[in-house]
A protein has these predicted regions:
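Non-heme di-metal
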Residues: 1-265
């Protein structure tokens, strides 16, 4: 696979995905202004990983949040989700060079948001007395998202799927952190959740551009197998946030009602 030209956004994306130090993952240099012309599709198979990150096939789940270690573990999981999201936005920028410039510019913008979110979570982890790498992580997003063969499938699983579910997860964990008196941790998650709305809206906009007006069944079929709506929602659904992101009440109702036994599935 030929590497992108130097001093291009594509090269920045390439270098970010392949970066193998925490500094380059958490604080990469700003991207150049120039883009490649007529670049080939590049589908990176796996990201670079800093030595501090211990990647496992199945990460230990967070249980209680009463103690600082439990909260740090939860935040560490969220940090790794944001890191993978940033990498996969850069991945898509390289994988789908034929898409409109506005779409690829949006991917770059969201990647930089996600990088900033990793920094927010890193600060919170340090506040609790731990560091990035203190807990094992799983590259689950990387196991699934690159199976998306088309731009429509990519935004179906990222913007309309995983990032939409984060609207619920951020709200739920913010409430749980606040319940045990960790206001700083709660506010960090609320900030990420608010900014996620624009990312979901981006997914809605471009799913409709690449596929069809947002419809639950069309979206469900666009998810790369074996993914289903089951993993693309939290509880309770954040209806107001999803509406602000452009999802209709009908879409939200169907998402909430969906089960693996739903007829037609």
């Amino acid at each position: 696979m030929r590497e992108p030209q130097q001093d291009t956004v594509e090269r920045w994306a390439w270098d970010y995905v392949h970066a193998s130090t925490l500094a380059d993952k958490l604080s990469p240099p700003p991207p150049p202004e120039g883009w490649e012309r007529g670049g080939a599709a590049r589908r990176i198979e796996s990201p670079g990983r800093p030595g501090e990150l211990h990647i496992v096939g199945k990460a230990k789940k967070t249980r209680g949040l009463d103690g600082e270690e439990g909260r740090a573990r939860a935040l560490h999981t969220f940090l790794h989700h944001e890191l993978q999201a940033a990498e996969l936005m850069a991945w898509a920028l390289l994988a789908f060079p034929e898409t409109p410039p506005e779409f690829r510019a949006g991917l770059l913008r969201i990647a930089r948001d996600e990088i900033r979110h990793t920094g927010i979570y890193a600060e919170q982890i340090v506040r609790l007395g731990f560091g990035v790498g203190a807990f094992a992580v799983r590259d689950w997003f990387w196991e699934r998202v690159p199976t998306a063969k088309t731009p429509a499938s990519f935004v179906a699983v990222m913007g309309l799927g995983l990032e939409s579910a984060n609207l619920e997860h951020a709200a739920s964990f913010a409430a749980r952190f606040r319940q045990v008196g960790d206001e700083d941790g709660a506010r960090a998650q609320e900030l990420v959740g608010r900014e996620e709305i624009a990312h979901v809206r981006f997914g809605v906009t471009w799913f409709e551009a690449f596929a069809a007006p947002l419809d639950f069944e069309i979206w469900r079929r666009a998810l790369p197998e074996p993914l289903t709506p089951l993993l693309m929602r939290g509880h309770p659904l954040q209806r107001d946030a999803r509406r602000k992101a452009g999802q209709s009440d009908r879409f939200i109702d169907e998402l909430e009602a969906w089960t693996p036994d739903t007829p037609g599935c």
